[in-house]
A protein has these predicted regions:
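Glycine-rich flavin
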Residues: 18, 25-117
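Structural signal for well-ordered, non-membrane alpha-helices
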Residues: 13, 17-21
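Intrinsic disorder at enzyme termini
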Residues: 1-13
Length: 117
């Protein structure tokens, strides 16, 4: 089995790595003020969304990037390497949204997915 990234995956990895290097905030996990942590994480998720890195595997018509699972894995790996904080809505992005995408009606998708991003 070949576990090497192909050229497009390497290109995406390099894009993400450069963007995170230029934009990632410091990890705030030691911040005592939880309100500040929540504020920071919301701002971070907004910045990630505006750059196209939230909802990577979600369909474009619901605000996602339309990427594949490998794109998401590459992004997750680069977030770990860069030691960035998680976005505020990790559960909604990773669990809630995908359930709505898979099983929701068109009306539910339009109503519930965009606010999760």
């Amino acid at each position: 089995m070949d576990f090497e990234l192909d050229d497009s995956e390497k290109s995406f990895r390099d894009e993400v790595r450069a963007w995170l290097k230029a934009n990632a905030p410091k990890d705030d996990s030691t911040e005592a003020n939880q309100e500040k942590v929540i504020e920071n994480r919301r701002a971070w998720q907004k910045k990630l969304y505006e750059a196209g890195y939230v909802g990577i595997t979600w369909p474009k018509e619901y605000g996602g990037r339309g990427g594949d699972f490998m794109d998401q894995l590459i992004f997750n790996d680069e977030m770990i390497v860069a030691q960035t904080p998680e976005p505020i809505n990790v559960i909604g992005l990773g669990m809630g949204g995908p359930v709505v995408i898979a099983h929701g009606t068109e009306e539910q998708k339009k109503r519930y997915l965009p606010p999760l991003l």
